[in-house]
Regions:
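Terminal, regulation- and interaction-focused segments at domain boundaries
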Residues: 1-26
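Short polybasic/polar patches that bind polyanions
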Residues: 22, 39, 99
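Compact, glycine-rich, soluble single-domain proteins
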Residues: 29-78
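Short secondary-structure transition/capping segments
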Residues: 72-85, 120-128
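Beta-strand/loop substructures that line and gate deep hydrophobic ligand-binding cavities in soluble
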Residues: 77-102
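Well-ordered alpha/beta subsegment
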Residues: 100-128
Length: 128
């Protein structure tokens, strides 16, 4: 798992992620607000959101090679606030994940990692 600090709030970071995905024509399949869900059952949680997105063209090819990777797809980025009020993004290490499924030689894995890093760097204002 990769963790990277954001200069913005959870809501602003998530909004920036959504804008980037929209500009790249990458579909968003779901968004979860864990803090909101916790409040609905009377529990407290620091801001914590997850966005689920990806390209069926890419994911399908991986699942054709090993259907078990479907548990990892579509791609996800979590944006959360720690107990000190610092905001973080978390996203998978695709190369490690791919090796668990025998897919480390698939060229798309590196591209998926680059995409995740690009989205996170731009949304957190940590452009490299």
């Amino acid at each position: 798992m990769n963790n990277q600090a954001s200069k913005f709030s959870v809501d602003e970071t998530m909004g920036r992620i959504e804008q980037i995905l929209q500009k790249m024509d990458i579909p968003v399949f779901a968004k979860f607000d864990h803090q909101k869900n916790a409040k609905e059952v009377g529990l407290d949680l620091h801001p914590n959101q997850v966005i689920v997105f990806g390209s069926p063209k890419v994911g399908t090819k991986l699942m054709q090679e090993n259907p078990a990777i479907s548990i990892e797809l579509p791609l996800k980025i979590s944006v959360w606030e720690d107990k000190n009020g610092k905001v973080w993004t978390s996203f998978p290490q695709m190369e490690r994940l791919a090796s668990e499924y025998g897919l480390e030689k698939e060229p798309v894995i590196g591209k998926m990692q680059e995409l995740l890093e690009k989205i996170v760097n731009q949304s957190t204002d940590n452009n490299k």
